[in-house]
Amino acid sequence: MEMNIGDMVAAMAARNEAFRGNEQVPEKVEAYNKLKEHAAAIGKVLRAPWYADDLELWEQNTFVYIDFPLPVNILNDSIRGRIAEMVRLADMVTLAEVRGRLRMTFTVARVWKE
């Protein structure tokens, strides 16, 4: 499902406190699981911390992030390929500086159906 920028921002900003997912969207869960696999592999090779949010029934969206030490120079073709695949899998990618590191956050939106 293609999402435009407005849809992505709305999906992330609108937190429905009453939301209770009752059915996972299989393709979204598959994307999330692949993101976790890639993050774990990158984290292991680069010794970079990473985190994967849990698939919670009350959260429509989930994310995986990796914290790269600055400056970031990635020469390894395999790592670059994994990052490119993560960008392709995610509905939204956010880059931010967090405590002297580059955090790449890969968000999967609408993981649950109500």
Region roles according to the model:
Residues 3, 7, 22-37, 74-81:
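Alpha-helix boundary/N-cap detector
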Residues 15-51:
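N-proximal, solvent-exposed amphipathic alpha-helical segments enriched in charged/polar residues
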Residues 77-94:
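Short, non-transmembrane amphipathic alpha-helical segments
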Residues 93-114:
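C-terminal edge-of-domain segments
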